[in-house]
Amino acid sequence: MKIFKINSYAKVNMGLKILNKRSDGYHNISTIFQEIDLHDELIISKNINGCQFSSNVNWLHNDQNNLCVIAYNHMKDLYDIKGIDIMLTKNISRGSGLGSGSSNAAAVLKSINKIYDLNVSDDDLIEIGSKIGADVPFFIKGGTQIGEGIGEKLIGLKSVIKGRYLIIIPGPT
């Protein structure tokens, strides 16, 4: 049985410019996304049927609101796969704006691709990810990218962060 361990990295938006609000509730933006070392950890393996999800936090559930489960369902609808078990260790604060849920979804897409030897291209994974959330496409490749539209139009860059940086995330209110 294949077991896949993957880190699911956070991102920061550098120089975020909100251009306007769209009729669908999203905003058109221009930004630079930078992947950072802070990450969640996922262990993903095959199972006979369905998506079995567990986590080290009690606020994430194995339901249709969970982005990991949503990512699995998209792949199951498109490809001949059975099930997966997902164990998620959360290290990134929820609601922090660092994209942890989107990053987790992208990690599930990439892991299913490898575990089931699907050979789906990054471009196709990006297309699937865009149906899950605006930040998911960025996390398929990660690194440093210019993001436009709602964040789904991406152009890769060489890393722009040099030196050290400090991210302050307020605790839960």
Predicted regions and their residues:
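DPxDG-like acidic metal-binding loop motif
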Residues: 96-124, 138
